[in-house]
C-alpha cells in the first residue's frame, strides 16, 4: 500500500482549492527554473531511469518515447497531451484536469523543454466542459505569473500551451486520429509509419502523451528517479491512479503503488465488493477495452502491466469495473459491443463491418436465440478483426468478447439451451 508521503496527487479529491496560490502550497511550480537549467538530456534520462510507462493504456516507456524526437530539425516540434478520456470505466484524467491542473501545466512545460517543443496542445474531451474551464483558468494564471509563455519561469525558454476542445468522438483518443482532429480534419487514425515523432502534427515532429504521464513528471524530477523506481515492482514502477466502479460499496479514484493486489485495492479503498468478496463474479481490470477476469483469477491478480498480461488481461487505463453475481455478464459485454460499434470511425472494413456484426450476435446470445455453433463463429470473427485494423479499436472491440467466451462459455451455452 502506498505511503501517504509518496502520493503525487495530494489534491486528487478536490479537498483544497486548485488555484495557483494553493497549488504552490502543495509543491507545484517549486523552483521549476532549476529543473529546466539542468538541461534536456538530464530530464529525459531521469524519466527513463524512473521507469515511467505511459499511463494511457499502452505502457510504453515515456523517456524512450521522448528520445525518439529528432535532436536537430528544421521544422518546429510539438507536444500534444491526450486529455480525450472517453474509455468506459475510466475517469482518472478528469480528476487531474479538475483538481490538479497546475501539475499538468508544469509537466507540459518540462516535457516540451525536454523534446524541444515551443508549442504544446492539450486536446480535451468535448464533454469535459468544467474541466476545460479549470485548465483554461490555470493557464491564464500561469501566463500572468510568467510561468509559461515567453521566458518561461525566467529560464530563457519560450513555451506556449493551448487548450483545444474535442467534439466527443471516442476514436480521437487514438493518437493519430487526435492529430487529424487537431488539424481540423475528420478524426480518423493514420497509417504508421510514418510515426508522429517524425511526421506528426502539421507534418512536424510530435510527441503525444497521456495526462497522467505528463502530470507526474515534475514530481519525479524533484524527488528523483530512484524514488519513483523504488515504488511498485521492477518494470512496473511508480504510482498509478485507479478508478474503481461497479458493484463496490464506495466507488472511487485512488492513487496507489503499481503492483498492488486487485483484491486489496478493492477492499481497502472501495469498501469491498457489494455483498462481500464471495459475491464477486468478474472484474474488468483496465477499462472496457481489456478482457475480463473471473473471480478465481481476481484472487491472485496484481495491478500492473506484466501481472495482468500473464493473467490474460491488461492494465489498460486502470479502470476497475467490478461485477457481482447479480450481473447479466453476457448483456454487460454486449453493451460494450454496442459502444465500439457506435464509436468505430468506419475507415477499416474489419472494424466497420465486424463491430456491428459482433453486437448483433451478442444480442442474440443475450436473448438465447443463437445456435451453439455461433459461439465459435463469434470467437473466430474476433480473431479476424484483432490485429487487422489501422488502430487498436478493432482489438478493443474483440477482447471483451474473447474474455467472455473464454471464462463464461458455460453460461452462454446454458442460456441458448
From Swiss-Prot:
FMN binds at residues 166-213. Keywords: 4Fe-4S, Flavoprotein, FMN, Iron, Iron-sulfur, Metal-binding, NAD, Quinone, Translocase. Binds 1 FMN. This is NADH-quinone oxidoreductase subunit F. It comes from Rickettsia bellii (strain OSU 85-389). NCBIfam families: nuoF_fam (TIGR01959), PRK13596.1 (NF010120). The keyword Transport does not apply. Its cofactor is FMN; [4Fe-4S] cluster. [4Fe-4S] cluster binds at residues 345, 348, 351, 391. Its EC number is 7.1.1.-. Belongs to the complex I 51 kDa subunit family. One of its GO terms (molecular function) is NAD binding. It holds the Pfam family SLBB_2. InterPro entries: ComplexI_51kDa_subunit (IPR050837), NADH-UbQ_OxRdtase_51kDa_CS (IPR001949), NADH-UbQ_OxRdtase_suF (IPR011537), Nuo51_FMN-bd (IPR011538), Nuo51_FMN-bd_sf (IPR037225), Nuop51_4Fe4S-bd (IPR019575), Nuop51_4Fe4S-bd_sf (IPR037207), SLBB_dom (IPR054765).
Amino acid at each position: 500500500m502506498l505511503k501517504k508521503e509518496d502520493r503525487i496527487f495530494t489534491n486528487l479529491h478536490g479537498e483544497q482549492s486548485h488555484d495557483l496560490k494553493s497549488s504552490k502550497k502543495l509543491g507545484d511550480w517549486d523552483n521549476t527554473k532549476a529543473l529546466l537549467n539542468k538541461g534536456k538530456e538530464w530530464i529525459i534520462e531521469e524519466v527513463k531511469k524512473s521507469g515511467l510507462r505511459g499511463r494511457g493504456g499502452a505502457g510504453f516507456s515515456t523517456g524512450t518515447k521522448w528520445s525518439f524526437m529528432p535532436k536537430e530539425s528544421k521544422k518546429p516540434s510539438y507536444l500534444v497531451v491526450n486529455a480525450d478520456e472517453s474509455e468506459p470505466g475510466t475517469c482518472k484524467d478528469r480528476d487531474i484536469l479538475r483538481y490538479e491542473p497546475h501539475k499538468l501545466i508544469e509537466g507540459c512545460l518540462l516535457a516540451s523543454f525536454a523534446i524541444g517543443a515551443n508549442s504544446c496542445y492539450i486536446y480535451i474531451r468535448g464533454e469535459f466542459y468544467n474541466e476545460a474551464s479549470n485548465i483554461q483558468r490555470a493557464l491564464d494564471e500561469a501566463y500572468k505569473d510568467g510561468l509559461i509563455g515567453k521566458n518561461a519561469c525566467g529560464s530563457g525558454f519560450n513555451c506556449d500551451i493551448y487548450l483545444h476542445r474535442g467534439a466527443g468522438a471516442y476514436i480521437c483518443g487514438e493518437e493519430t486520429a487526435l492529430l487529424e482532429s487537431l488539424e481540423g480534419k475528420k478524426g480518423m487514425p493514420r497509417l504508421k509509419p510514418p510515426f508522429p515523432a517524425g511526421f506528426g502534427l502539421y507534418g512536424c515532429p510530435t510527441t503525444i502523451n497521456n495526462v497522467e504521464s505528463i502530470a507526474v513528471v515534475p514530481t519525479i524530477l524533484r524527488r528523483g528517479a530512484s524514488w519513483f523506481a523504488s515504488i511498485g515492482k521492477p518494470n512496473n514502477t511508480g504510482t498509478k491512479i485507479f478508478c474503481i466502479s461497479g458493484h463496490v460499496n464506495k466507488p472511487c479514484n485512488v492513487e496507489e503503488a503499481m503492483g498492488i493486489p486487485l483484491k486489496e485495492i478493492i477492499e481497502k479503498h472501495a469498501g469491498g465488493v457489494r455483498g462481500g468478496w464471495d459475491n464477486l463474479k468478474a472484474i474488468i481490470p483496465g477499462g472496457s477495452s481489456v478482457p475480463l477476469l473471473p473471480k478465481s483469477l481476481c484472487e491472485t491478480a496484481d495491478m500492473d502491466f506484466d501481472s495482468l498480461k500473464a493473467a490474460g488481461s491488461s492494465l489498460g487505463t486502470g479502470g476497475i469495473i467490478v461485477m457481482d453475481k447479480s450481473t447479466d455478464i453476457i448483456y454487460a459485454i454486449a453493451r460494450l459491443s454496442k459502444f465500439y460499434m457506435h464509436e468505430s470511425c468506419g475507415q477499416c472494413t474489419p472494424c466497420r463491418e465486424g463491430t456491428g456484426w459482433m453486437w448483433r450476435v451478442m444480442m442474440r446470445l443475450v436473448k438465447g436465440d443463437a445456435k451453439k455453433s455461433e459461439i465459435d463463429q463469434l470467437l473466430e470473427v474476433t480473431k479476424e478483426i484483432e490485429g487487422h485494423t489501422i488502430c487498436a479499436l478493432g482489438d478493443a472491440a474483440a477482447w471483451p468478447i474473447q474474455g467472455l467466451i473464454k471464462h463464461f462459455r458455460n453460461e452462454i451455452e446454458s442460456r441458448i439451451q
